[in-house]
Each structure stands twice: as C-alpha cells, then as structure tokens.
Amino acid sequence: VLYYQGEMKDLDCMNTVGIVGARRCSQDIKKKCYELTEKYVEENKVIISGLAKGIDACAHTACINADGYTVAILGNGLDICYPSEHRILMDRIKEKGLLLSEYPPGTKPTKYAFPKRNRLISAWSDKVVVIAPGKGSGALITEGYARKYSRKIELYEVK
C-alpha cells in the first residue's frame, strides 16, 4: 500500500531522476544541486528525493522554483512533517508535486524507515544522482539500491 497527497501523475512512463546527498553541505554543493536539478527540469524529468535536510530539500526546492514536478518519498506518515522545519516545503510539494509514503498516517519517523524510503527513491528513479555523500550516508544506501535495481548512477564529489 502506498499513501499519497498531491497530484498523482503516471510516473511509469516519465523520465525520473532521484537526487540525494549530504544533509550538511556547503553553498558550493547546494549550487551544484540547484544547477543539476534545473538542468533535469529543463529536460522534463521528474525529480524524486526524500525531503531530508541538505541535498534533498535543495533538489525539491530547485525543482519547484523551476516549475518542475517533484516527488517526496517520506519515511513516515503523510500527516507528519519531518524534519519539522520543512513544513512550508512539504506544503509546496503537495501543491506542485506529490508526497508519497508506504507508512500509514500517524507513523513517526524511525531510523529503520529511512533505508526503506531510500529503496523506493531508487526503485522509482530511472537515474540516481548522488551529490557529496558522506561516509555512512543514507545517500550511499540509495546508491546501493540503485545498483541492485540496475539504475543509472551519477556521483558528484564537490568540495
């Protein structure tokens, strides 16, 4: 079962790009994320990410600002905003894109939920872009699933 809020489009026939990476990142890394996201939106790609701090939020924001369609896959119920400071971004995604979760309403985020969320990001993406992942980063879990699912992978190390 998948729960959703927002505008559900036929994602099976769309070109989708998952964008994940560092939660703590410099302005240079965020700039690279914005540039890549804008390029993919110009190519009519759907941007998929996980609403986490850092690269995820940057990708969703850049996509919306470029009038693209973004999907946020959550590691909790749709009625819970995590992280809480992303409430405005979450509301913008509901208006201009799609929130998606395999967790029923009321489900709080746990450390076990995020690797499962990362699995869905890879599964729904034709290509996964990993930007400046740190050691032990959840972005590397997403990359691992992308390899398992034979997805295209782009890795960007930005200093």
Report the location of each language-model feature.
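Glycine-biased, small-residue-rich flexible motifs in mid-sequence functional cores and linkers
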Residues: 1-159
